[in-house]
Each structure stands twice: as structure tokens, then as C-alpha cells.
Amino acid sequence: KYQVLPFFWIPEENIDQRVRRDHVPYDVWERQGFLYTTEGNVVHYGFIETFIEELGMKYNIKEIAFDRWGAVQMTQNLEGLGFTVVPFGQGFKDMSPPTKELMKLTLEERIAHGGHPVLRWMMDNIFVKTDPAGNIKPDKEKSTEKIDGAVALIMALDRAIRGGNSNGGSIYDLRGLLSI
């Protein structure tokens, strides 16, 4: 069984505006500890990098997968902190195998996330896009829907599988936490 420990962030200055605009209970999730806020009206990546650094001290993080089209500065900063960062494509080639595996593991009840409401909401927002060859990848049908956490889970699952965690035990017992 794979144990998932998700973390999510939102800018604190516009959380109320986002609640009204998106009709999503970000404020409730923040009060319940399922969503973290960062100072200002945009996500403060320095805060997240520090958070990841602290996780690295607590867990044995082997590597961090990232979308190579949007995380150049954070990737460089995390490398500077000593983390191994691995580029991960968002197309069918890279996303299809772990997406299919996540679907299989979910049906087998081998993914545990403790009922995390933010991750559950993002998973519910996924629309599975299929190419002519039968490859699949996550997509979203509406621009207001968020699927970032679901995509991060798929990327982390791929890295966990490639890391050789096939014994059915907790991934944390073998190699620590993957953070994306």
C-alpha cells in the first residue's frame, strides 16, 4: 500500500476572493490544516522551498519530480539545497503509465491519503484524456478546476515505482518522502 502525504498552498491575501470565485472551501481547509497559506497575493515559493527543506530533514527525500515547463527557479533552488530533482513531462508518454497504475492501485484500495479533502477534490476534477494509441493523461475540463495535486501524485507514484518499492510496504519505510 502506498501512503500519500500531500501538502497544498494558497496565497493568504486572496483566499476569501478565491472561495467566492471558485465556490471551493479553501478557508475551511486552511482552518482544518489541509491547506497552508503563504504571505501576499501570490504563492511565495521561498516559503515552500523552506517547507520542503524541513521535510527533507524529517524524511529521507531521495528526489523531487518537477514539470520542466514551469519550475526552473525552484528547481535550481532545491538543487542548491542538496535535493535531486528529476524532470517529468506532462504529455502522454510520461503520464500514461503512472496514471494507469494509479487507477489500478485506487481500485485495489492500495493508495491511502487519509481522506485528505484537497487531494480528493483535485482527483475528482480529473478528466482522463486519451490519445489514438490508448495512452492516457490527466486533464481538466474547466479552467477553474484544480488538478495540480493529482498530477503531483501521479508524478510521485512514477518515481516511487522507478525507485523499486514493489514489496507492498510503505514507501517511507524504504526511501522516505517524495515531495512535488
PLM features: what roles do these ranges have?
Residues 99-107:
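Short, surface-exposed amphipathic charged segments that create phosphate/polyanion-binding patches used
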Residues 1-90, 96, 100, 113-180:
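RNase H-like, metal-dependent nuclease domains and their acidic two-metal-ion catalytic environment used
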